[in-house]
């Protein structure tokens, strides 16, 4: 272990920079209220294999399934340029690039979001490099520029980012957020582009090469992402460290998923991505269908799995065992309620592309609201502790 072990994490917590995150209405909720969810789920099924196995086809193209952002619920504010222009972005550990809408974008998705005007920034430098992020539902295309990015008190100079010129995706039009700030490994970014976190570290702006998330369960406020240190007041007990199994995504090995001592999924071990850009618990279709049956969730005409809201008081915890440590997810976490419609639904979602022989999961915000999470790039590991 490097010099900044657990004690280092605590003693250097005063050096960290904390960015507030605000809980927002998810795209799923917006689609459900507009009676568009069924059509969307049928037309754009999520493909987890794309997220796990993608390799860049060329220097300017990256594949990111927009389905991943259907349930995103937290965003924070950054600014771009001099003087600063503000944007609401998703801090996403499941992708690596930063992009925001630009004034050159004429798509409907750009007309109702903040757009960056490079002509009003004295520090903007155009690169001429095209960029295309291909989603499960469409694409975001544009070009790469360089400018000053401000994240709370951090001033990230000469940062490469994407400026959208075309956003034909209907989901981006309905999104509350303006853009995405990726926090995954550089190997996932568009070739030649240094991600924000790496640029911050290279400029000596961080005391430790790590960041952490606390996602509050107490309403819209209280959630934070912190850079360069860890604030122990956000968790109880000790951090348990899990090695990253594949430094592309924040991917780890998981031992099993069980209820009352009986393994119900991930039997014999599997892989899991810890992903702040996903809200639900995603896994192989067969395994998830088995879990839906166990918790008595019923498939609706929209394709979602609904459940009796009173079941939250009777259903058991579901235990995710990671590196020998059990992380229980209680019913009040894996059952979510749409307050506007007064209905409850399962937080598990299946993916038809994955067979049980190559079982992979994504642990999204349902899991992360329960467990404070540290993403340690120096040691390629993830730290988990019970969130306060």
Swiss-Prot record:
EC main group: hydrolase
Keyword presence, Signal: yes
Disulfide bonds: 105-110, 266-270, 309-344
Enzyme Commission number, as recorded: 3.4.23.-
Record keywords, A-Z: Aspartyl protease, Disulfide bond, Glycoprotein, Hydrolase, Protease, Secreted, Signal, Zymogen
Gene3D superfamilies: 6.10.140.60, Acid Proteases (2.40.70.10)
UniProt-annotated catalytic positions: 92, 275
A single GO cellular-component term on record: extracellular region
InterPro entries in the cross-refs: Aspartic_peptidase_A1 (IPR001461), Aspartic_peptidase_AS (IPR001969), Aspartic_peptidase_N (IPR012848), PEPTIDASE_A1 (IPR033121), Peptidase_aspartic_dom_sf (IPR021109)
Residue spans crossing the bilayer: none
Cellular compartment(s): Secreted, Extracellular space
Gene Ontology biological process: proteolysis
Cleaved signal peptide residues: 1-15
Keyword Disulfide bond: yes
Tissue occurrence: Trophoblast and placental tissue.
Domain Peptidase A1: 74-385
GO molecular function: aspartic-type endopeptidase activity
Positions glycosylated per UniProt: 356
Protein family according to the UniProt entry: Belongs to the peptidase A1 family.
Protein name: Pregnancy-associated glycoprotein
Lineage: Eukaryota, Metazoa, Chordata, Craniata, Vertebrata
